[in-house]
Amino acid sequence: LAGLPGRYNSYVGIQKEQKDSIDMLVLGDSESMTSISPMELWKSVGITSYICGQSGQRISESYYMLKHALDYQSPQVVLLETNMLSRYTNTPDSLRSSISDTAMYYFPVLQYHNLWKNIVNDQIPEGWQSYKGFAIRPGVAPYSKGSYMKKTKKEKEIPQINLWYLDKIRKLC
């Protein structure tokens, strides 16, 4: 949605789609919105999809984005990009972010105060372009310099708050 600040695109965009027209919703951080092309999915296999991800999306944001999207869509598949599971530890800042995300869901005026006229009046912002949540990045090329990941036996626990939201997402699905 050109003309909207980045974090608002998916929130407003999903409600502009025809009701129950999306087969697959994608949630996650920037990898979700730059790696999966709804136009290519439609062209190659006939699946309608919408990317509800955003840069640095926290799992709590994914949960509330999914809740919002399900008010407008009944997808057959929800794809969850999992980078966010290992991010944010069990710290006061993480808890504060979670509380903030909850407040913004139940009181959207807190986060979307600049968009209230478009949302209430069901107006499409000037300059609107729909790429179904996909972020077009010209000049991006695949990495071709060999393996960049090292095999290790180290394990990292997923923070409890992230597991809690993951379970809430599972239950919503």
Regions found by a protein language model. Give the residues of each.
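Secreted/periplasmic serine-hydrolase-like ester/acetyl group-modifying domain
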Residues: 93-172
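Alpha-helical scaffolding within the catalytic cores
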Residues: 9-12, 34, 64-67, 164-169
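Conserved phosphate-coordination/catalytic loops
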Residues: 2-6, 60, 156-164
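Second-shell loop/turn segments in exported
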Residues: 26, 51-55, 152-160
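N-terminal secretory targeting modules
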Residues: 1-23
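Short, compositionally biased "basic patch" segments
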Residues: 1-6, 35, 138-140
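Hydrophobic helix-cap positions at the C-terminus of alpha-helices
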Residues: 69, 172-173
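Membrane-embedded segments
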Residues: 27, 31-113
